[in-house]
Amino acid sequence: MYKENKNKLEILLKKVANEWDLKICSINIQTNQNPTVVKIIIKKTNGDDISLEDCALFNAPASEEIENSNLLNCSYVLEISSQGVSDELTSDRDFKTFKGFPVNVQLNQKNSKKKFLNGLLYEKSNDYLAINIKGKIKKIPFDEVLKISLCTLKD
């Protein structure tokens, strides 16, 4: 019964989200809490960042939809939030924002025996990624890079 109601609720909330140019990434209903906690993770359909105001604006129509559906027959707390920041760096904005931060570079191993390199993000160009590894700048061609993620450096 719980799963069926959750699925129905998810369908209703996705319709509401579409009206606000939002997409629901996940809905988590924590019935082990008192009151029950309904957590909804949203993102914008155009890819822009979610603001606190976006979450607040979506709260009222989401709450209204939950109330009108009568699918939750208990008191609950509604939490609307964004996915947060991804650890993976993909956009030029990411590379500018996190310059100097520790990164983990996953390599494709075509030309290297190493799977990963760790260092501080130094520079990104169209052709290569440069990281600072213990004071030495290492340029890695992008055709050798699978993934670049934020990490914590260990000595």
Swiss-Prot record:
Location(s) in or outside the cell: Cytoplasm
KW Cytoplasm (keyword) present: yes
InterPro entries to which the protein is assigned, alphabetical: Ribosome_maturation_RimP, RimP_C_sf, RimP_N, RimP_N_sf
GO cellular component term, pick one: cytosol
Cytoplasm in keyword set: yes
SUPFAM superfamilies, per the entry: YhbC-like, C-terminal domain (SSF74942), YhbC-like, N-terminal domain (SSF75420)
Keywords attached to this entry: Cytoplasm, Ribosome biogenesis
Domain of life (superkingdom): Bacteria
Any single GO BP term: translation
PANTHER family tied to this protein: RIBOSOME MATURATION FACTOR RIMP
Function: Required for maturation of 30S ribosomal subunits.
Family that this chain belongs to: Belongs to the RimP family.
Protein name per UniProt: Ribosome maturation factor RimP
Source species of the chain: Prochlorococcus marinus (strain MIT 9215)
Organism lineage string: Bacteria, Bacillati, Cyanobacteriota, Cyanophyceae, Synechococcales
